Amino acid sequence: MAIKDAIEKIVSYFDADEVTDHEDVAKERPVKVQKTEQTPPQQQRKPERPQETVPPRRQHIKSDVQKTQVLRSLPLSRSQVNQGSQQMNTTKTTIAIKYPKKYEDAQEIVELLIENECVLIDFQYMLEAQARRCLDFIDGASKVLTGNLQKVGSSMYLLTPINVVVDIEEISLSHGNQESTFDFDMKRR
């Protein structure tokens, strides 16, 4: 009986469906123990040892797989990490395009910022003096609401909430003379 048990243990150790075989072996053992109570305690302990080593081995394999998955994901760039965190925080980011025609339209633009929407503002339909006032109001509101206001064109600005990162390189405008006539950048001296 001991040889048969040893062979079953070896076969079940290498079997693909180890969980069900160990359960079957565990169910059979109490019956055998009841029949042969005269066996010394050392022989009863030996069959249990392979069962104890199998589950930690599975856990070791699972932890190796998890480590491999973690190592594969390590060389992500910052943009990929930012995209992942942004996807967790917000499901969708929308960009509203606004063409303000009067100063009162600035309040509507700020309300969109409060709702965490990006706003592309084009001041082409406003006079320069009104556009400066409107831009001052929007810039102040963006500071209070921890937003970001960036110039993206000669008369266009991008207003974004704090959870949106915009990476804009220097944009060379094809109409260089247009920028000089319609430039209301507040940081100019």
Swiss-Prot record:
Full protein name: Cell division protein SepF
**Basic and acidic residues: bias regions:** 22-35
Looking up InterPro entries in the UniProt record yields: Cell_div_SepF, Cell_div_SepF/SepF-rel, SepF-like_sf
Any one Gene Ontology biological process term?
Answer: FtsZ-dependent cytokinesis
Which residue stretches belong to region Disordered? 18-65
This protein's UniProt keywords:
Cell cycle, Cell division, Cytoplasm, Septation
Among its keywords, does the record have Nucleotide-binding? no
Concerning its family, UniProt says: Belongs to the SepF family.
The record describes its quaternary structure and partners as: Homodimer. Interacts with FtsZ.
Function according to Swiss-Prot or TrEMBL: Cell division protein that is part of the divisome complex and is recruited early to the Z-ring. Probably stimulates Z-ring formation, perhaps through the cross-linking of FtsZ protofilaments. Its function overlaps with FtsA.
